[in-house]
């Protein structure tokens, strides 16, 4: 993207987020800020900054929250507008370039921005790509359905850095924790000479914070496709906070009592036989 490397602030990792925080600290609160990307990260970033009093524009591309159902999208849009976020979406809202003080859209419009935040897409560490093992286009290790590298049975991957059968799961805490447990089970099975089990991963939805006092919970099928059902407002914020606390307490419990972690399971994925186990 022309100008993105020079003039936009990514927020994909801690160091990038620190750079952004420093830039915002030097910016007057009334100065315009643009957030590019309308996935959960972009939505949450726009909401947090607007709640602090920032003048925020969320540049969505074609649609706000592509994953969301219509009710979920309405819930998010309503809260963002309450916070004062200007939402730009539609066919002409793709970003064409980033300039020092503006975001240029595909239809020629310019969105004034003294700090442009780039939230479009996640990255992964380059360890797998540097290893010489096969990866997908963004560097996730290609594995079979037991999370074992298709090139080396001694290597197991989990979480955001794994691409089982070339069809990775959504980058999320909801996937990473169960994949970590299943990767451990794969290692234990191989140590004793057993055949590891294929991953079984179920999703329940997606939690989006909209500032400190509200949120949206998008309910999904177990295959991670959205249902036309959502929870909004303060209740959604409380649910997400409870989930975050439960995640931390679950990790602590697993450390005290190994094997105590449980997760919601679905049937085998359609890709389960796509890549043979090494």
Indicate residue ranges for each PLM-predicted region.
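A conserved beta-strand/loop capping segment in the N-terminal third of enzymes
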Residues: 1-4
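FAD-site-proximal beta/loop scaffold in flavoenzymes
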Residues: 6-30, 110-178
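Rossmann-like NAD(P)H-binding beta-loop-alpha module
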Residues: 21-60, 64
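A Rossmann-like FAD-binding core segment of flavoenzymes
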Residues: 52-145
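A conserved FAD-binding loop/helix module that cradles the flavin
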Residues: 129, 161-211
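C-terminal auxiliary extensions adjacent to catalytic cores
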Residues: 212-278
């Amino acid at each position: 993207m022309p100008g993105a490397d020079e003039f936009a602030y990514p927020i994909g990792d801690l160091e990038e987020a620190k750079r952004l925080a420093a830039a915002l600290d030097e910016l007057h609160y009334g100065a315009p800020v643009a957030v590019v990307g309308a996935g959960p990260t972009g939505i949450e970033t726009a909401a947090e900054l607007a709640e602090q009093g920032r003048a925020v524009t969320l540049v969505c591309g074609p649609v706000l929250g592509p994953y969301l159902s219509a009710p979920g999208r309405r819930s998010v849009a309503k809260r963002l507008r309450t916070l004062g976020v200007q939402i730009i979406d539609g066919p002409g809202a793709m970003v064409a370039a980033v300039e020092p003080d503006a975001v240029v859209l595909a239809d020629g419009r310019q969105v004034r921005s003294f700090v442009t935040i780039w939230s479009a897409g996640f990255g992964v560490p380059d360890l797998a790509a540097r290893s010489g093992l096969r990866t997908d286009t963004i560097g996730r290790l290609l594995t079979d359905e037991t999370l074992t590298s298709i090139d080396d049975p001694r290597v197991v991957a989990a979480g955001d850095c794994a691409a089982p059968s070339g069809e990775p799961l959504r980058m999320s805490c909801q996937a990473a924790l169960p994949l970590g447990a299943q990767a451990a089970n794969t290692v234990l099975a191989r140590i004793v000479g057993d055949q590891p089990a294929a991953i079984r991963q179920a999703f329940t939805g997606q939690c989006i914070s909209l500032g400190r006092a509200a949120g949206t919970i998008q309910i999904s099928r177990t295959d991670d496709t959205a249902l036309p059902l959502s929870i909004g407002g303060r209740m959604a914020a409380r649910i997400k906070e409870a989930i975050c606390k439960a995640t931390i307490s679950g990790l602590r419990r697993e450390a005290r009592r190994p094997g105590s972690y449980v997760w919601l399971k679905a049937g085998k994925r359609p890709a389960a036989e796509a890549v043979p186990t090494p």
